[in-house]
Design a protein with these regions (language model features):
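Positively charged, polar, low-complexity stretches
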Residues: 1-90
Length: 90
């Protein structure tokens, strides 16, 4: 199944609350990816824009918040909604 087919299946099989969860999961995953890429590029410590003093990269906070959202959905067992090659994941 393609990603689009999985989303279509989720929309058809789940009420609106589940659709909102799927959308939030996808958004959180995208935020986590972007934050991780920024941290890899600029490091965990960066310069303050006005003072130049070293500070923790603000994307660390974004990455942590997104990961917490992803973990929350793992507790809700949304992994059973996603399939690879038409097979349900255990």
């Amino acid at each position: 199944m393609t990603h689009a087919q999985i989303i279509a299946s989720l929309i058809a099989d789940n009420p609106r609350a589940k659709l909102a969860e799927v959308n939030l999961y996808a958004e959180s995953f995208q935020q986590w990816q972007e934050a991780t890429a920024n941290i890899r590029e600029h490091g965990a410590i960066c310069a303050h824009p006005r003072t130049g003093q070293p500070i923790p990269n603000p994307y660390l906070t974004v990455q942590t918040a997104a990961l917490k959202n992803l973990q929350r959905f793992a507790r809700l067992r949304t992994d059973s909604l996603w399939r690879l090659d038409g097979e349900a994941q255990p």
